[in-house]
């Protein structure tokens, strides 16, 4: 997996092991959204959604694919410094693609159930782990508002402990960077590009309103798959 590939001079020198890992890396493509750009209004404006998807997410995809191509070339030439440099680009842009692909699924228009409280086993798990849905939302909003710079706030599940967790990650680091057993259920993008056109510098208002279009049905499906 691109985000876990560690490049070293020793790996490059031996060659075979890293080349086998490299074969598992694939180029990415921009996924279609399951709704129109304006379908999440007024919580998230159509202008933001279009810019976020077509420009920002597309840039992560383009830069990842470019870095992957350059990595293949550097490996073939035995260029260890370039390989090490490209690892950072692959991690950042690959994380950007993975995180945003989850983010789009985490949202749904109100007419399609966006904002409806979680049902089933996830609803029970939230009450057990946090006391109530309101307490969970309050904690995630506080974590997201307090995050310095750019990053993400996540609701995840530890698939071994069967326990819900709230985590933040910096920049485009995915949730798995906080633990190999963590699976994302919901991720909220708190980069300024996710809200600034509409909410200016008032991130708490964005965090408050995004719950009105949260796709808890999707989150519950992931939870039940990981914790049957």
From Swiss-Prot:
Cofactor binding mode and count: Binds 1 Mn(2+) ion per subunit.
Transit peptide boundaries: 1-24
Keyword Oxidoreductase: yes
GO cellular component: mitochondrial matrix
Binding site for Mn(2+): 52, 100, 189, 193
Keyword Methyltransferase attributed: no
The name this protein goes by in its record: Superoxide dismutase [Mn], mitochondrial
Keywords: Manganese, Metal-binding, Mitochondrion, Oxidoreductase, Transit peptide
Origin: domain of life: Eukaryota
Entry's Gene Ontology molecular function annotations: manganese ion binding; superoxide dismutase activity
Top-level enzyme category: oxidoreductase
Localization terms from the record: Mitochondrion matrix
Major location category of this protein: mitochondrion
EC identifiers of the protein: 1.15.1.1
Catalytic activity reported: 2 superoxide + 2 H(+) = H2O2 + O2
Family: Belongs to the iron/manganese superoxide dismutase family.
Gene this protein is translated from: SODA
Described function: Destroys superoxide anion radicals which are normally produced within the cells and which are toxic to biological systems.
């Amino acid at each position: 997996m691109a985000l876990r590939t560690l490049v070293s001079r020793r790996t490059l020198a031996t060659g075979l092991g890293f080349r086998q890992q490299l074969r598992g890396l694939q180029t990415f493509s921009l996924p279609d959204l399951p709704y129109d750009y304006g379908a999440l209004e007024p919580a998230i404006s159509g202008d933001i959604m279009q810019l976020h998807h077509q420009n920002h997410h597309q840039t992560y995809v383009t830069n990842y694919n470019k870095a992957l191509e350059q990595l293949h070339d550097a490996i073939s030439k035995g260029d260890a410094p370039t390989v090490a440099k490209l690892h950072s680009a692959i991690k950042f842009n690959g994380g950007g693609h993975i995180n945003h692909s989850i983010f789009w699924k985490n949202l749904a228009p109100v007419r399609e159930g966006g904002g409806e409280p979680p049902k089933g086993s996830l609803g029970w798990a939230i009450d057990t782990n946090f006391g109530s849905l309101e307490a969970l939302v309050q904690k995630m909003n506080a974590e997201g508002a307090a995050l310095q710079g750019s990053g993400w706030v996540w609701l995840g599940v530890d698939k071994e402990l069967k326990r819900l967790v709230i985590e933040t990650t910096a920049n485009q680091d995915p949730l798995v960077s906080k633990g190999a057993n963590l699976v994302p259920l919901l991720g909220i993008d708190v980069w300024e590009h996710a809200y600034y056109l509409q909410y200016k510098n008032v991130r708490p208002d964005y965090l408050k309103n995004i719950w009105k279009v949260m796709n808890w049905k999707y989150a519950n499906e992931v939870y039940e798959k990981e914790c049957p």
